Each structure stands twice: as structure tokens, then as C-alpha cells.
Swiss-Prot record:
It comes from Homo sapiens. Belongs to the TRIQK family. It comes from the Eukaryota. May play a role in cell growth and maintenance of cell morphology. Disulfide bonds: none annotated. Keywords: Endoplasmic reticulum, Membrane, Transmembrane, Transmembrane helix. This is Triple QxxK/R motif-containing protein. It is a single-pass membrane protein. The lineage of its organism: Eukaryota, Metazoa, Chordata, Craniata, Vertebrata. One of its GO terms (cellular component) is endoplasmic reticulum membrane. PANTHER family: TRIPLE QXXK/R MOTIF-CONTAINING PROTEIN, TRIPLE QXXK_R MOTIF-CONTAINING PROTEIN.
Length: 86
């Protein structure tokens, strides 16, 4: 019986360490949460490079369409035909 009772009693040093650990965890919990949120926001944020690449691709596409229609719709004037001949 003596052994069973002795095992359940914790040393005051162990109780003190446990209490200090709980207090430390309570102090660092908001800091850890803020750090996690900051890392997640940084991970999911769109960078300037990606935005620049998308804008450059759209601009290149628009210029290609413009060049295609400009070259397609311009009429070639033959120098052999004189329009002033009536």
C-alpha cells in the first residue's frame, strides 16, 4: 500500500515545472498563432511577378490580335492602277 500512495504524490519541483510550462504556453500561444497566420498569408499571397506576367501576357495577346487584324484589313494599293484616270 505504501508504494501505491507514494507514486501518486508528485514532487513539488515537478508541480512547479508543470505550472511554469502552462504559464509559458499561455504566453506564447498568441505569438504562435500570429506567426502561423503571417506565414499562411505570405504563402497564399499573389506576388508582383505573377501579376506582371499575367499583364504582360494579356498585352502580348492584344497586340497580336491588333497586328493580325491590321495586316488582314489593310488594302494593298497597286501602283499599276491609276485611280485618277476618268
Amino acid at each position: 500500500m505504501g508504494r501505491k500512495d507514494a507514486a501518486t504524490i508528485k514532487l513539488p519541483v515537478d508541480q512547479y515545472r508543470k505550472q511554469i510550462g502552462k504559464q509559458d504556453y499561455k504566453k506564447t500561444k498568441p505569438i504562435l498563432r500570429a506567426t502561423k497566420l503571417k506565414a499562411e498569408a505570405k504563402k497564399t499571397a499573389i506576388g508582383i511577378k505573377e501579376v506582371g506576367l499575367v499583364l504582360a501576357a494579356i498585352l502580348a495577346l492584344l497586340l497580336a490580335f491588333y497586328a493580325f487584324f491590321y495586316l488582314r484589313l489593310t488594302t494593298d494599293v497597286d501602283p499599276d492602277l491609276d485611280q485618277d484616270e476618268d
